[in-house]
């Protein structure tokens, strides 16, 4: 089980993941975010794309963190969004939320 924060966990952790995979060890990314480990660093679509391409190529499952409306970079929804009344479209999504929505829809 791995937790990934794209701006913090870069090539060194991708290499570790690949080594585990080559050894036949089971791997699941139980949470990943599109920023640094604090959950509130800069949004990093470049590192996110590197991670998701690798995970898809290895057929490793992953779950995005965080589907909330907290005022932080990792949140999928804008601060103050009523999660009980989410509308379709992207108006309530953060940059991270839009990236993840598009990734899941296209992969």
Segments predicted by a language model, with ranges:
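Extracellular glycoside hydrolase catalytic/binding regions
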Residues: 1, 5-61, 65-69, 74-106
């Amino acid at each position: 089980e791995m937790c990934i924060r794209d701006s913090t966990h870069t090539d060194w952790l991708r290499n570790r993941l690949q080594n585990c995979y080559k050894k036949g060890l089971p791997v699941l990314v139980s949470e990943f975010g599109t920023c640094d480990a604090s959950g509130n660093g800069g949004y990093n679509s470049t590192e996110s794309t590197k991670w998701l391409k690798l995970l898809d190529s290895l057929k490793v499952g992953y779950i995005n963190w965080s589907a909330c409306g907290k005022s932080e970079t990792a949140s999928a929804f804008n601060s103050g969004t009523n999660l009980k009344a989410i509308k379709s479209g992207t108006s309530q999504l953060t940059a991270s939320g839009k990236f993840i929505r598009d990734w899941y829809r296209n992969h």
